[in-house]
Amino acid sequence: MDSQRTLLVLLLALVSFLLFQQWQVAKNPAPQAVEQAQTSSTLPAPSFADELDPAPAQQASAKLITVTTDVLTLSIDTVGGDVVAADLNQYSAELNSANAFELLRDTQGHQFIAQSGLVGPQGIDLSSNNRPSYQVSADSFTLADDQNELRIPMTYQANGLEYTKTFILKRGSYAIDVEFDVINKSGNNATLGMYAHLRQNLMDAGGSITMPTYRGGAYSTEDTRYKKYSFEDMQDRNLSLTLTNGQGWAAMIQHYFAAAWIPRNEPGANLYTRVIGNMGDIGVRMPNKTIADGDSAHFTATLWAGPKLQDQMAEVAPNLDLVVDYGWLWFIAKPLHWLLSVIQSFVGNWGVAIICLTFIVRGAMYPLTKAQYTSMAKMRMLQPKLQAMRERIGDDRQRMSQEMMELYKKEKVNPLGGCLPLILQMPIFIALYWALMESVELRHSPFILWIHDLSAQDPYFILPLLMGGSMFLIQKMSPTTVTDPMQQKIMTFMPVMFTFFFLWFPSGLVLYWLVSNIVTLIQQSLIYKALEKKGLHTK
């Protein structure tokens, strides 16, 4: 029995070590630009790669306009109308920094931009070095206090066609509608279609073999709710998928934040990736429309550029909220995040919410915990009989196993009963780890006193040391029948090893584990008192 518990504790330690590796990668990412030979590819109709000059886009021109809302500050290049910078006004770059987090940017060393345009026979974005120079009414646009919507129209004329590209931003929203209106006065039919993609330097996504982090592409279609498509995948093979019903999106995601293009009412759109030099594109090419002389056409797509806020993203597009990737334990992590958010809405502090969540989870598991300690106590009571049985039977393992099972059945003892709560707690622990790791709400969220960021490690290691001390107390209070010296050393070393791993874990996760241990000490005391009355435990 105690050997099984030792094995489970070792397994939990291994899980903690793997999570520790993952946290180190997430905390200290080291992306490296990946050089790639220039690539040209052909995609099924509509063939985007054949329509747009594959030369890498030049750095943003000096003709930029600034668009500011309560949550976003955008820089839009009037040449092509690309979004070349996006600052998230309500998210600081670093803790206590006055600078906003830059999601999109176009600098000498790094490019991550959102491009959109019109291609096809009468398209105006067929060459990356000869894109339209739009006219705008001002150099800056700001959402006024009495406004809920801000519209920025940009106009261009060529060959008898009038083009208007409009950016529409709304208060409190990270979703940006991008619309094209084309009026044909050329005297002939005009055929063109819209494209929208994200372009970023190819990077090493980082991570470990066991539990990798992720920075790269992702997409959704009618048949695939959510799938990652890494920079390495892009280099191996260009993606080309048809959105039969027009439902889907293409995204570039990273820790806490994402950018995505969502086509609107465009059945038959083509979702694609391309590699150009050391740049990777992922986006959507909408079907062509033929505009008769004197007629007009309308094209639209939505750009999400912001934090991974699940509720808002789910409203913008189906499955867009799945970029908050909880891994294979999502069915546990998602309800935990929901419950944590509900609690926080009442208590107003994410640290207090974690404490409350811990009490709820451990309270729900109390019947199992009680059964565990009762089973362990009964097993200890059977030790004299088991020892006598070993002396009587000797080395006959088959007979020993048979008589042990008969004894367990007679005494109504489940030898695995003490392991069940530990087995159940491991997936909850892992799911909560991912819930805390993926929750942008915890980023730079303070708790009390010295804890200013629950998503970062404790700067003074106070919580990990308290957690290690609580594990030591639990160990001292727990009776054991372990006689093997090696197992005794392993169990004694466990608090030290866990403390070491947890030194660099997010303080929110360490807080959960510390409070969970405190609850264990309380429950343990109550259960032992009840067992003493039944004669199953002695101090």
UniProtKB/Swiss-Prot annotation:
Keywords: Cell inner membrane, Cell membrane, Chaperone, Membrane, Protein transport, Transmembrane, Transmembrane helix, Transport. The keyword Transmembrane helix applies. It is found in: Cell inner membrane. One of its GO terms (biological process) is protein transport. InterPro entries: Membr_insert_YidC (IPR019998), Membr_insert_YidC_N (IPR028053), YidC/ALB3/OXA1/COX18 (IPR001708), YidC/Oxa/ALB_C (IPR028055), YidC_ALB_C (IPR047196), YidC_periplasmic_sf (IPR038221). The keyword Cell membrane applies. Pfam families: 60KD_IMP, YidC_periplas. Its main location: membrane. One of its GO terms (cellular component) is plasma membrane. One of its GO terms (molecular function) is membrane insertase activity. The chain crosses the membrane at residues 6-26, 341-361, 416-436, 454-474, 495-515. It is a multi-pass membrane protein. Belongs to the OXA1/ALB3/YidC family. Type 1 subfamily. NCBIfam families: PRK01318.1-1, PRK01318.1-3, yidC_nterm, yidC_oxa1_cterm. Required for the insertion and/or proper folding and/or complex formation of integral membrane proteins into the membrane. Involved in integration of membrane proteins that insert both dependently and independently of the Sec translocase complex, as well as at least some lipoproteins. Aids folding of multispanning membrane proteins. Interacts with the Sec translocase complex via SecD. Specifically interacts with transmembrane segments of nascent integral membrane proteins during membrane integration. This is Membrane protein insertase YidC. It comes from Vibrio vulnificus (strain CMCP6).
